[in-house]
UniProtKB/Swiss-Prot annotation:
Needed for the assembly of the mitochondrial F1-F0 complex at high temperature. InterPro entries: Fmc1. Belongs to the FMC1 family. GO terms for cellular component: mitochondrial matrix. This is ATP synthase assembly factor fmc1, mitochondrial. It holds the Pfam family Complex1_LYR_2. It comes from Schizosaccharomyces pombe (strain 972 / ATCC 24843). Keywords: Mitochondrion, Stress response, Transit peptide.
Amino acid sequence: MSTPTTVYRSLLRQLREMNVIYKTSTLKQKKGFTKTQKDFLVYTKACLRNNKVEQLSKFQEVVAFLKSGNQHELLFNRHHPLANVNELEKVKLAARRVGLESPE
């Protein structure tokens, strides 16, 4: 069984990874956690200090959920590289693919 410390650390790890994965070029995000994530971490820390087994297992499920979401986003971006590209860039890439240069 995991200890509260390992669950909290794995939760931090997944939230940091989520911030890196979901950051896009259009969204200028500061380093660190969002306000919602900070509030969640404060709540998590308070709950894990109680050392209740049912709360610990719920947070383990949250970690598994975040991990699977991060993995899904990585795989989606790998298999659909044009998903986060605007229409003009898609046209330029398609033209370049067939040997044409699109006008500026």
